[in-house]
UniProtKB/Swiss-Prot annotation:
It comes from Drosophila pseudoobscura pseudoobscura (Fruit fly). Residues 130-226 are annotated as: I-domain. This is Flap endonuclease GEN. Transmembrane segments: none annotated. Residues 514-523 have a biased composition (Basic residues). The gene is Gen. Mg(2+) 1 binds at D30, E74, E142, E144. The keyword DNA damage applies.
Amino acid sequence: MGVKELWTVLTPHAERKPINELRGKKVAIDLAGWVCESLNVVDYFVHPRHHLKNLFFRTCYLIWEQVTPVFVLEGVAPKLKGQVIAKRNELQFRGVRPKDAATGTQTAAKVDKGRTRFNHVLKQCETLLLSMGIQCVQGPGEAEAYAAFLNKHGLVDGVISQDSDCFAYGAIRVYRNFSVSTQGAQAAAGGAVDIYDMREITSRMDFGQHKIIVMALLCGCDYCPDGIGGIGKDGVLKLFNKYKESEILDRLRNWRAETDKYNALEMRVDDKSICSNCGHIGRTQSHTKSGCSVCRTKRGCDKTLWKEQRLSIKAELILRRKALLAPEFPNEEIISEFLSEPPTIPNLNLGWRQPNLVKFIKQIGHLLQWPEIYCFQKFFPILTRWQVQQAARTNAIGRVELVQPVDIIKKRTVKGVASLELRWQDPSGSFQGLIPDKQISEFELEHPKGIEELYYTVEPLDMLEAAYPDLVASFLKSKEKPPKKATRKKKTDPLSAIENIPETLDKQKANPAKPKRVVKKKKAPTEQAQPSLQQFLRREKIGGTPVKDSLPQMAQLPQQCSTPITKFLPSDLESDCDAVEFDMSDVVNGIISNPNARPTVTRHEGRQLHYEALSDDLSMRLAQLSLRKDELQEEPLPPVAEHKRDLSLVEHLPQSKRLSLDDSFDLLVKGDLKKVPHLIQPIRTPVDRFKHQHRISEHLPQPAVEPAANVSYFFNQSSDNADAFEQLMNSSLGIQEQAEEDEEEEDDLVVISD
């Protein structure tokens, strides 16, 4: 469990690092923490001894990362933890709980069995670790306490633990959330761990071992699971902000001893006659309105004098009042448990010892339920790695190696580390008979190289160079490629060539140079290659092109083409489906032969194809084509054409759009200018535009009358004693009423569908 709420305080200061950050270091591991973590996996079917399997592979991972683990075993549990252990045993071994509860006649020794069952599990783990050559140490009490002690005195570089109690025991560097898996919430590629360094945390926030002990007393820990009721993390942190690390424990002890002092502080904090902002005599409300004479202010007062101090004192008084409700607070046994240390520093040999393959197969194989050949496959690389690391030391001592490298097979790269794959041999026959013949025969059926593959391992290149330099050097030399021979001849010195002219001439006469044979390459024929333009022009003209029998008949027909061509082109008259090769030479000749020739065909189906340039002005042409007004709109226009003409008169449209919709020029060409009234009488005023849009007919022009004096324009233009403006308005209103009546008639219609 550890100290409650401690991880939430320290987690913001943790660093997530890969496990290779621990390379070359010694780390103390709380073995009980790993075992409990494995035993709590009950959500799905797992290995019957999952804790042993998990311990083996985790330890192997640390060995591959060149980390030296030191496992710390549990000692005698403190009496303060007896209640917590009893509750854990009930939860862990509830399936084998005795039927009858313990009676008062039972002795205390029989009831308080301690960790008998758990110690048996730890003993199995110790046997596994000793066979792997890993050191196990047993502390006098809690494992995390002894691991913190080793870290505090520099025997190990850190502690791997999930229990926050190790901080209360004085651990300096703690590794939490150790993970070698690539799945789950704590997954990381290649393994990762959270690093908590108390030296950095203390320098940032003045938070050390003593404050952690106070937090354990107030919030709760393994020795007082409930803590003090009503006190949480926020209240404790406010207390830590007020006092330093070195004085926090003494302040906590004085809560019960200095009663008079805290009673006086409580009276001062609650006194209404003292301002809560500045602490001077006077109510807070009066100081806010009239000011404070001591602070020398006319309005308000100095809040920095008393307000923050009053709040911190009040928070401490609240914590004190709640804590003193517990008669044993502060519990000196808990404080001494966290601060006590072994009297002497042990002289421990924490190095990696030689693994014992035979012991692992004989004692641990049946616990893990692994066959002998599988145990050999998993354990043999551990033995070879230890031998590679300790090769220099063992050679100096003169110890005989169990296995020897035969040769290097190939280069390998493991997680970015240059490595080599080796083949080993057992010269002394130490491992003969460990694997049954039946398992060997089954292995040989699946692996073509046979039992030899069991002796293949992969080791780092730098370790092999230090352990077996001759073997590595010979392998690397065999892999070196010979230098390439220079194929390019060196240039001769011109001076030497001049000096040896006679010899050079003699060599040339003796070995005359053979003339080079020039081979003409034939071009591969291309299928239906497209000829160039010059090839078209070089061909025969019209006489050379194939002509159909129907050509004389077509020649008698009049030409109906607006292109200025003076003669027929036979290739144009042929069908597109003819099998004759497509030839455009006659087309090109027809275009370039006489470009100034006049067309002979000028009309087609009654329409003129070629027009002569207008010598006169366009306005003169319009005047010649102007007709009488009674001939306007003789033929009804299609709705689309009428709509286009209306749009050509809209001013808000751009000029390019109006010009594209205007069909005046087309009508001019056809001679139908009489159908466009706005070309005869252009629109000049908004009134003319309104007349045109609503198709308002005009009266015949009246004979010219001399304008009367003082008469308006519209009255002067009147006819039949009516004003022209009034006639215009009446006609427009009449059109609107007629449109409304048409809409009403359409609404009265009922359409019956099929």
